[in-house]
């Protein structure tokens, strides 16, 4: 019998008395031995994201195609409880909405789980509607960042979503599936949102899981052709194959543009020993040679990072890896140890060259710290990547020029420039939109579209500045020579780049003949579907 706790209800527009809900289900003693697969099949899906114009899907030849770690964790957890999960990665395998629906109807799972990023909500809704039309008994469960930040609004808008799992979903999904199979009442399942007629009901959440070591190993074995079919972005790795690991969850900072707080600000981490075990597993079973750590804040704990590095060094493990960091979390001592342990690249969220913009973002950092962090990292022999945002509220012609000059002054090897996007769940979203939810903007929220322009500027002007900042960084002789050497040193980059350029030339010719000109999704490419409430 599981323990029970009393938790007050938090229900939109409806109050209920306190009730007893179960704590997480007990798991088998040996997490590597799943329970017998005697229960239902469960499809876990990432829907197609409308980022690229039709005919230009090959752009994925050079972009990051990492599998969804969230789905891998969910699959591993429910498999422990006897369910039979399988994963459909739409974007990675160029699957359309119709392709996904066809696969689901062919496999006939009892449950369909769809992860929702804002850009994919409309396609997820279309998939759900078509599945429901052909198989009304199939239960659609949604989760992910978007639903965790806008559960009520999304469930009211798209009625083919049966149940939403809010926040980290491993234990909640296992509880939910077991409850549904037993014919239980949804009121007894924590961490979910669902509709009762026109009323949105929100069940209380489970306590945050602090012990990530308790989670089973991600179900990499369910991925077809892993890791070959899931490469990192070109020039973003020194060798193949590549795999991703999240060594921790959560971020204690509160940058206004970021939606990470949707899953909580409290940092929870695997032990260094468990992370090392994951690395060894990927090496031994899949031949992985480079790890991308995708933590919100990899260097949240220097002692933990130090211990992991020592485990790698002392064992003689030959692995290279990349991670992200804030500029105020690095020091020469830890950087030197990271380099010895195989750290190849650190990505820093620098965001802007203007202290004024950084302050308005609540970034809790400044230009001087950024310059020092990049200097220390470069001195340690670790490659540096700068992550920037253009078009944030308060941006002006002057701040853009300051950022442009700042980017060029840094000894960074790669620069990612994102078009400011006010994601649901971020503090800035509510500031800009208030309660006026623009769901017609959701399908464009991919960092490739300016949906909003600061006062005194237009979207067209922002697009011009965006191109100018990018080209001013990459068209310099120093950068062109660097990428030439990198291409010659790592032939895997050359093969993918040549394949991309060939496909691009062919597609560009076709598009010009057809009177089209865009690589990124254009307004005329989008299909706006009318969903009945």
Where are these regions (language model features)?
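N-terminal [4Fe-4S]-dependent radical SAM core
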Residues: 5-38, 48-59, 189, 195-247
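Glycine-rich beta-alpha loop elements in corrinoid/cobalamin-binding modules
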Residues: 70-211, 425
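Proline-aspartate-enriched helix->loop->beta-strand connector
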Residues: 108-112, 288, 412
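Radical SAM enzyme core and accessory elements
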Residues: 1-44, 80, 101, 110, ...
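Flexible glycine/acidic-rich beta-alpha junction loops that bind and position SAM and/or redox cofactors
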Residues: 51-54, 151, 197, 302-303, ...
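Radical SAM [4Fe-4S] cluster-binding motif and immediate context
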Residues: 218-387, 392, 401-405
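Structural recognition of alpha->loop->beta junctions
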Residues: 153-171, 340-345, 402-417
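Short, electropositive alpha-helical surface patch
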Residues: 99-100, 104, 309-312, 396-411
């Amino acid at each position: 019998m599981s323990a029970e706790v009393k938790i007050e209800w938090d229900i939109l527009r409806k109050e209920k008395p306190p009730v007893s809900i179960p704590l997480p289900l007990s798991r088998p003693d040996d997490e590597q031995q799943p329970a017998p697969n005697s229960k239902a099949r469960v499809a876990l899906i990432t829907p197609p994201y409308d980022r690229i114009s039709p005919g230009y899907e090959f752009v994925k030849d050079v972009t990051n195609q990492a599998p969804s770690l969230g789905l891998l964790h969910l699959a591993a957890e429910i498999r422990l409880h006897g369910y039979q999960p399988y994963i459909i990665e739409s974007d990675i395998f160029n699957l359309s909405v119709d392709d996904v629906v066809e696969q689901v109807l062919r496999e006939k799972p009892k449950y369909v789980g769809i992860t929702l990023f804002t850009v994919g909500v409309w396609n997820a809704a279309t998939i759900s509607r078509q599945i429901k039309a052909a198989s009304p008994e199939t239960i659609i469960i949604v989760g992910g960042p978007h639903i965790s930040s806008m559960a009520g609004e999304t469930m009211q808008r798209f009625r083919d979503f049966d149940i939403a799992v809010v926040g980290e979903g491993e234990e909640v999904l296992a509880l939910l599936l077991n409850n549904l199979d037993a014919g239980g009442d949804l009121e007894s399942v924590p961490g979910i949102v669902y509709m009762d007629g026109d009323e949105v009901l929100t069940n209380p959440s489970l306590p945050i899981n602090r012990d990530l070591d308790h989670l089973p190993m991600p179900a990499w074995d369910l991925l077809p052709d892993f890791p070959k079919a899931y490469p990192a972005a070109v020039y973003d790795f020194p060798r193949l194959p590549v795999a991703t690991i999240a060594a921790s969850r959560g971020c204690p900072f509160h940058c206004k543009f970021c939606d990470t707080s949707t899953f909580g600000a409290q940092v929870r981490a695997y032990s260094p020993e468990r992370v090392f075990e994951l690395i060894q597993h990927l090496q031994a079973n899949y031949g992985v040679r480079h790890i991308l750590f995708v933590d919100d804040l990899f260097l949240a704990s220097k002692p933990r990072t130090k211990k992991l590095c020592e485990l790698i060094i002392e064992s003689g493990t030959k692995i290279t890896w990349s991670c992200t960091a804030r500029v105020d979390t690095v020091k020469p001592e830890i950087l030197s140890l990271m380099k010895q342990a195989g750290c190849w690249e650190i990505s820093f969220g620098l965001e802007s060259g203007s202290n004024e913009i950084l302050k308005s973002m609540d970034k809790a950092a400044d230009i001087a710290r950024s310059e020092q962090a990049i200097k220390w990292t470069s001195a340690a022999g670790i490659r540096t990547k700068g992550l920037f945002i253009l078009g944030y509220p308060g941006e002006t012609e002057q701040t853009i020029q300051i950022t442009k000059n700042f980017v060029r002054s840094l000894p960074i090897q790669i620069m990612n420039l994102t078009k400011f996007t006010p994601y649901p769940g971020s503090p800035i979203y509510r500031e800009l939109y208030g309660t006026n939810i623009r769901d017609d903007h959701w399908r464009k929220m991919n960092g490739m579209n300016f949906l909003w322009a600061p006062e005194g500027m237009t979207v067209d002007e922002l697009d011009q500045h965006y191109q100018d900042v990018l080209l001013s960084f990459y068209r310099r002789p120093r950068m062109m020579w660097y990428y030439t050497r990198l291409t010659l040193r790592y032939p895997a980059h050359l093969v993918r780049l040549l394949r991309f350029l060939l496909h691009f030339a062919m597609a560009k010719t076709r598009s010009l003949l057809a009177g089209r000109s865009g690589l990124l999704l254009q307004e005329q490419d989008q299909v706006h579907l009318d969903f009945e409430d």
